[in-house]
Amino acid sequence: MRLAASSLLLGAAASLLSSATALAVRSDNPGSSAGYFVRSLPGQPPGPLIKMHAGHIEVDHATNGNLFFWHFQNKHIANRQRTVIWLNGGPGCSSMDGALMEVGPYRLKDDHTLAENEGSWHEFANLLFVDQPVGTGFSYVNTDSYLTELTQMSDHFIKFLTKFFELFPEYESDDIYLSGESYAGQHIPYIADAILKRNADASIKWNVKGLLIGNGWIDPSNQYLSYLPFAYESGIVEKGSPIADQIEKQVAVCVKTIAEKGRHHVDLNQCEQILQDILAKTKHHKDGKEVCWNMYDVRLEDTYPSCGMNWPPDLSSLTPYLRRKDVLQALHVNPDKTAGWTECAGAVSSSFRALKSKPSVELLPDLLKEMPILLFSGNKDLICNHIGTEELIHNMEWNGGKGFELDGAPGTWAPREDWVFEDEPAGIYQSARNLTYVLIYNSSHMVPFDFSRRTRDMLDRFMEVDIGKIGGTPADSVIGGEKAPITSVGGTPNSTAAVEKEKERVDQARWAAYYRSGEVALVLVASAAAIWGIFIWRQRHRRRGRRGSYAGLGGLKMTGGSRDRLADGRESFDEDELRDLTVASPMFERDRDLEAAEARRYSLGGVSDDESDDEGRIEKRPSVG
């Protein structure tokens, strides 16, 4: 009997040590969340790094389809946990534009130096950037397997999110906001619709709370026909001129095509030609070069036929930075599976014509029954201009009314309210029946590039952030003559309640991470050591022929207690058989130090250059044209 008990103890210790070794190995590969942890970032600003994860997630084994993501943890804890997913357009343009030129925590000062972005959207929300469809940016797929339709894209995205939440279950119960710009105006509604369908049969629902689409390509039939009116409004084309007459003829061809083929198309070549004609017929010579208007910011010019493809200026730093070997290693990019980073993948765009897909505007009425949607437009963008967005709203029927009619008052339109940000006219707000439209002054196709702090104020208001208990200095934002709710702070969380909530979340996330990462190996090793110690003590005790107490175990202290569970009920590893055994050892002292360091890192965020010199900088990119 004694031999059996001794064998059992030895077997348990060996089993625990074996498990610890296996877990330690798994913690360093991409199959665990620890394998995605970004420990350092080349060119990072001074001070501790924001907590982030990055890498690939497989969405289609048969075609070698993998999507790349980059996730940043929030800076402040607000009244609820939120995750904002950001997608750039194209199709085929990388969301690293959004991460490093628009709403992410960092901006590039040059090709090797990062600066903090004062207007980063991670202030009150976790940020998740995804390169999609497959083949975009750092994502990859077999070259004969590029996607062609919007439903294929949304299916891949559901698979991506499923695996992402398996790796990071602490974020699955967050309020989710889907955001992006340009051709993401097609992607975002399709993804939202797919999530709602998935939720119908899922035990754990994904809480999609809203959509934000900037300068979105949503309703092609209305937006194609907005090109010439915008060219008139902005002075690019003079109404009644010979150039105008030529372009009007192409508009007539487009109108005829829509009448014949119907409005249920995402891509019509005859209508695409309108924009090409505007750019080609208004080109001129300047300083010995042939130049044209920048289609993303009509305040600017570019060499023909680029017409904006050389902008924004940050792109000249972004491309070499994202091709650096140390950056690829830091972000866990698979160097064998992807070519050097390019902003927009021509092969993806050429394949993704969505010829069998209906335009996303047809999904909006049903989505507006389930969630609020915000459409925002920079007023200097030509390719996805504000006139087209306003026309699609005016012609759309949703929630019992048409356009911005007020509830119960047909024919009465919601007022346009002036938005003043820090004593400067910032734009116009208009809302009705779950839809909000924001026109943003002096901004391009890439609004957050121009005014990141203003767009964050817009985001935080849309998410109904309540920071009353956090403290800090609020932004000065006024809508319709009334002070807007406090939605922005400076500094770090400074109230007792905020600190306690922060500590609680860090503790919960830490214990969840224990199981998913190799750190659980520390507990198992310590437990195995304790069992081994018990075995040695019992052997000595039997040899001495007398009773003893556990207090005599060299340096090992036994205490009662069990681990806390995550608030959402997910279990960490089972401790029923070890609940009376906790080891006080240098490993646990190290864990306390790590916890303190993690708590400090959790509160850090970004700050960047002042917006006053941002005017004139613009984004790329739909390849919508």
From Swiss-Prot:
Active site: 182, 381, 445
Catalytic reaction annotation: Preferential release of a C-terminal arginine or lysine residue
Source organism of this protein record: Tuber melanosporum (strain Mel28) (Perigord black truffle)
Pfam families associated with the record: Peptidase_S10 (PF00450)
EC numbers: 3.4.16.6
Protein name in the entry: Pheromone-processing carboxypeptidase KEX1
Signal sequence residues: 1-24
Chief location bin: Golgi
Lumenal compartment segments: 25-516
Record bears the keyword Iron: no
Cellular component annotations (GO), alphabetically ordered: membrane; trans-Golgi network
UniProt superkingdom: Eukaryota
